[in-house]
């Protein structure tokens, strides 16, 4: 197996040395280059293209955002953002510009360096699973969420007096690459959709609320972080809180959400399997499962149960997903499903959730 070449970009010499030393100790990493800002990093990329980059965002001369914009136009290379927990908005902005994932600088951990090392081990393992096609692909995916919603979105998103129960519920699972893909998907959803959406995006605590707020600005569907026993409403999406799991439960006025601790032995949190299994139990053929990009097999067991109970299962085409693991696991589990590119997924969800499909 070929050794990976890494580039560490950070204006702090201490951070550069620390991250480089940790990467140098990992199996599979053969060489680590260093750069103190975006301009220097671009020169390194031109001279010796790395297999992946760890990137600080706040730097002099050419900051991380400008660097990402130039890099994705010239040399699409996997970028992992290294940022503090207080910089959540910046992290999601970087993901929209093309970064594939992030790791949080540990401040309050008992053993912060060990926490950082564990995250780096996970991310380096991820690099080898990335789809080259997805990395070369559509740079128009660098979507801006800072703009106000379109006129059409503003019109249909005006608050209503009554929350209508949805005809169907779309449950979505995603991991690495998910935030960017979800932005694309939500921009192509239709305002006549007779459904609610519940999203299990693998993400640590304290990040999911910011993600929900940014996703809320993308189009016609309102988005918020899921709350305990919140009743599902048509035209609304709910993001599972980081570090917790969400299950769909029955109520006297339609399906609702229960925020719970992960099941014993759950490796991925928020758990896609836990969400999908609850949707299968409560909703049966009124549930639609969607498995997007991500490492591992979370969602495969839940998709099998959902399909067994009559629900539809859609997966992002593994060949074009940033990380094929999760959708590929559904395919290998012999679950009845449809495999579509991200543009096709939006259209298919619209077809399955039309009011006349009830």
Model-inferred region functions:
Residues 1-7, 12-28, 34, 39-47, ...:
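Conserved acid/base catalytic micro-environments in cytosolic active-site loops
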């Amino acid at each position: 197996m070929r050794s990976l070449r890494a580039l560490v970009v950070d204006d702090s010499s201490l951070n550069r040395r620390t991250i480089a030393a940790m990467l140098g100790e990992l199996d599979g990493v053969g060489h680590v280059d260093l750069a103190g800002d975006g301009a220097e990093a671009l020169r390194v990329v031109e001279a010796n293209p790395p297999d992946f980059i760890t990137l600080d965002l706040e730097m002099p001369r050419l900051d991380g955002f400008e660097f990402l914009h130039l890099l994705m136009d010239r040399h699409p290379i996997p970028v992992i953002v290294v940022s503090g927990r207080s910089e959540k908005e910046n992290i999601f902005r970087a993901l929209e510009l093309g970064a594939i994932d992030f790791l949080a600088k540990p401040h309050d951990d008992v053993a912060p360096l060990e926490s950082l090392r564990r995250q780096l081990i996970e991310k380096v393992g991820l690099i080898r699973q990335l789809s080259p096609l997805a990395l070369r692909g559509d740079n128009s995916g660098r979507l801006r969420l800072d703009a106000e919603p379109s006129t059409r979105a503003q019109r249909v998103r005006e608050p209503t007096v009554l929350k209508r129960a949805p005809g169907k519920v779309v449950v979505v699972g995603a991991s690495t690459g998910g935030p960017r893909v979800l932005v694309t998907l939500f921009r192509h959803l239709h305002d006549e959709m007779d459904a609610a959406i519940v999203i299990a995006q693998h993400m640590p605590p304290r990040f999911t609320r910011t993600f929900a707020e940014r996703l809320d600005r993308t189009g016609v569907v309102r988005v918020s972080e899921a709350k305990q026993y919140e009743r599902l409403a048509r035209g609304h999406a709910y993001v599972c809180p980081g570090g917790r799991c969400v299950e769909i439960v029955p109520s006297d006025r339609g399906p609702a959400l229960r925020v719970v601790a992960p099941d014993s032995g759950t490796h991925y949190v928020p758990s896609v399997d836990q969400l999908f299994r609850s949707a299968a139990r409560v909703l049966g053929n009124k549930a639609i499962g969607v498995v997007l990009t991500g490492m591992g097999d979370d969602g495969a067991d839940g998709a099998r149960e959902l399909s067994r109970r009559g629900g539809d299962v859609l997966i992002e085409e593994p060949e074009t997903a940033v990380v094929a693991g999760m959708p590929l696991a559904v395919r290998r589990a012999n679950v009845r499903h449809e495999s579509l590119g991200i543009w096709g997924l939006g259209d298919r969800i619209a077809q399955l959730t039309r009011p006349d499909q009830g």
